[in-house]
Amino acid sequence: IHLSASEEVTFSKISAELQDLGFEISAMGGSSYAVQAVPAGLEGLNIPDLLRDMIASAQEKTTAIHDEINSTLALTMARKAAIPMGQVLSNDEMENIFNSLFSSSNPNYTPDGKNILCILKQSEIEHLLE
């Protein structure tokens, strides 16, 4: 991956957090870097784009404290690793996702804070179908 000067400055600030998350990135000289390993579950993604998004997120955070950077990086990774809407899944894949969701510590909300599920009364459903 080749980084601009501003991206390189931000990258140097977050490289330890990236390593903690499971990335292995080494300098190749100039502004070029080699990605040697990525966190489990991110294989097959466009890693240069993912890293640029993570760097951009870190650049937007002017008060970049350790926890905030980790939260931003983890959220970016979660968004990139998410199953695209409309993707067809096998029954086993759906069952695995369902079981993983309800064994998580917060099964009600996405990383962005959006509702995953909503309980409606029968009267509310009937009203929606009118």
Question: Where do the language-model regions lie?
Answer:
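Long, charged low-complexity intrinsically disordered regions
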Residues: 1-130
